[in-house]
Amino acid sequence: MSDQIIVSTRAFPASGTQDLGFVYGTSCFSANFFKDTFSAIRNTTIGGELGNYTKLMDEGIKSAKERMIENAKALGADGVYAVSIATPQVASGAAEIIMYGTAFKYVN
């Protein structure tokens, strides 16, 4: 899976593929206490984008995607389709990301 095919469509359009099953990647990052406190104050007084949280989410999504791809590679996959992202909250001040989909490979 060196050329990663990652798509969000529910049905992969190409014929000649075989589903390999469900794959996922998870990530959980904690915010820095001081940055978290500053972001909370800024959110209630100034407004605007909370760059610390945006960066946290970006890092979490990237990490979850990499782990999902690793799990797909372990199955011998050429890609993953029906990719979705969930962001459950398991801890305050943390970014939790689950990225999941269906691994597939091309068959001759």
Language-model segments: residues:
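N-terminal presequence-like segments and the immediate start of the first folded domain
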Residues: M1-K35, A74-D78, A95-N108
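Short alpha-helical interface elements
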Residues: G47-G48, K62, E66, E70, ...
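Short, solvent-exposed loop/turn elements at beta->coil junctions and helix N-caps
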Residues: R10-F12, I85-V90
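Short, well-ordered alpha-helical segments
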Residues: V23, D36-S84
